[in-house]
C-alpha cells in the first residue's frame, strides 16, 4: 500500500497506527492472510486500501461481514475522510438501510436500468417501502409440501463439545468450550470479528484437523471412531463467506447447486434428472429462475451468494 501511495513517511506511519487502532487490528497483524476470519479479512482489505491514500474511493458493500462496532467505526472514518481530506467516495450498496450519513447523492439501479440522480433526502423521502416478506405464499407452500425426512433425522445430540480447545502456535482461538445442540434447537452464533466463530463452525463441519484431538460428538457419533468426513458432511448444508471466496468455479449454476447433493467443491458425479429437478426447485425459491445454465463466475457476488444458499438447502440437510 505504501508503494501505491508513494514515499513511506512519518505521517503515513501515524496514519497506519491510527487505522490499526481504529479497526482493532493489532491482535491479528502477525496472522497469515489465509487464516483471517471473513471480518478480519474485510478489515485487512479496507486498511490496505486506505493506506494507499486514494483520491477516489469506490467500495462495494463495505459493511458486509463487519460486526456492529466495526461498521460504526468505518462509518465514522469515512465521514472524517470525506470532510477533512476531501476524499471522493462512491459506495455500491445492496441495502438502502446501509446508506451512511455523509452520502449526499444517490443513483438507484433497478432491473438493469440506471435511475436519475437524486439527493439523499429526496431518495429517502420517495423510496418504496421495504418488503416485509419476499417469500410468496406459493413458494412457502411448495417448501412445506416437500417429502418429510424425519426418519433420516434421528440424532438426539446433533453437536456436543466437551472442554474443546483450539490453538495455533502461541495463539489460543478457543479454550475449554462446552456446547451442546439437541435435535430441534435453532442457534444463533454471535460475536465480534475474530472471536472464533468460523473456527467453531469448522469443527462442526469436520473441516478442522484439530477436531480429531478434541472431545466432539456429531450426530450421536464421537469424532475419530471410524466415521469419515463424508459421513458427517452428508448431514450438513453449509455456506459462509470463506466458502464463497474459495468456490470460484467456472461452471453452470445448476451444477454448483447440484454439488451440494454430493458434498463436493465442483461436480464429479453426473446427477440424475430428479436431482436436477431439486436444484431447479431451490433456484426458483431464491428467485434465480433462468440462470441455471449461466456461468457461476459471470454472476454478481450477490447472485453467487444466493446460488450457494440454494446449494446448502438442496439436500434438505439435518443441520443447516
Tell me what each language-model feature is.
Residues 159, 173-176, 292:
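Conserved structural motif at the start of ABC-family nucleotide-binding domains
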Residues 215-231:
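ABC ATPase NBD Q-loop/coupling interface
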Residues 190-192:
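The feature captures the beta-strand-to-loop junction immediately N-terminal to the Walker
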Residues 46, 309:
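Hydrophobic anchor residue at the start of the ABC signature
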Residues 57-61, 320:
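Catalytic Walker B motif of ABC-type/P-loop ATPase nucleotide-binding domains
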Residues 1-35, 241-298:
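ABC-family P-loop ATPase nucleotide-binding domains
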Residues 111-142:
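Conserved beta-strand-loop-alpha-helix hinge in the C-terminal portion
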Amino acid at each position: 500500500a505504501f508503494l501505491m501511495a508513494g514515499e513511506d513517511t512519518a505521517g503515513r506511519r501515524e496514519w497506519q497506527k491510527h487505522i490499526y487502532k481504529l479497526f482493532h487490528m493489532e491482535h491479528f497483524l502477525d496472522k497469515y492472510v489465509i487464516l483471517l476470519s471473513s471480518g478480519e479479512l474485510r478489515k485487512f482489505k479496507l486498511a490496505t486500501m486506505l493506506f494507499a491514500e486514494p483520491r477516489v474511493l469506490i467500495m462495494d458493500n463495505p459493511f458486509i461481514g463487519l460486526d456492529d462496532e466495526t461498521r460504526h467505526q468505518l462509518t465514522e472514518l469515512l465521514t472524517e475522510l470525506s470532510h477533512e481530506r476531501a476524499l471522493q467516495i462512491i459506495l455500491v450498496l445492496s441495502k438502502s438501510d446501509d446508506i451512511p450519513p455523509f452520502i449526499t447523492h444517490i443513483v438507484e439501479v433497478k432491473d438493469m436500468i440506471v435511475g436519475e440522480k437524486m439527493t439523499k433526502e429526496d431518495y429517502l423521502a420517495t423510496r418504496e417501502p421495504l418488503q416485509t416478506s419476499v417469500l410468496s405464499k406459493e413458494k412457502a407452500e411448495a417448501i412445506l409440501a416437500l417429502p418429510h425426512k424425519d426418519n433420516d433425522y434421528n440424532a438426539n445430540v446433533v453437536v456436543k463439545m466437551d472442554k474443546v480447545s483450539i490453538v495455533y502456535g502461541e495463539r489460543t482461538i478457543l479454550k475449554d468450550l462446552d456446547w451442546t445442540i439437541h435435535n430441534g434447537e435453532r442457534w444463533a452464533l454471535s460475536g465480534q470479528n475474530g472471536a472464533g466463530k468460523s473456527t467453531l463452525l469448522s469443527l462442526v463441519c469436520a473441516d478442522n484437523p484439530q477436531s480429531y484431538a478434541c472431545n466432539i460428538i456429531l450426530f450421536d457419533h464421537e469424532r475419530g471412531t471410524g466415521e469419515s468426513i463424508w459421513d458427517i458432511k452428508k448431514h450438513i448444508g453449509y455456506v459462509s463467506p470463506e466458502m464463497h471466496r474459495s468456490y470460484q468455479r467456472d461452471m453452470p449454476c445448476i451444477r454448483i447447486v447440484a454439488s451440494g447433493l454430493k458434498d463436493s467443491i465442483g461436480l464429479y458425479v453426473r446427477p440424475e434428472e430428479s436431482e436436477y429437478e431439486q436444484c431447479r426447485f431451490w433456484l426458483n425459491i431464491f428467485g434465480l429462475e433462468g440462470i441455471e445454465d449461466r456461468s457461476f463466475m459471470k454472476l454478481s457476488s450477490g447472485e453467487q451468494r444466493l446460488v450457494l444458499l440454494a446449494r446448502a438447502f438442496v439436500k434438505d440437510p439435518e443441520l443447516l
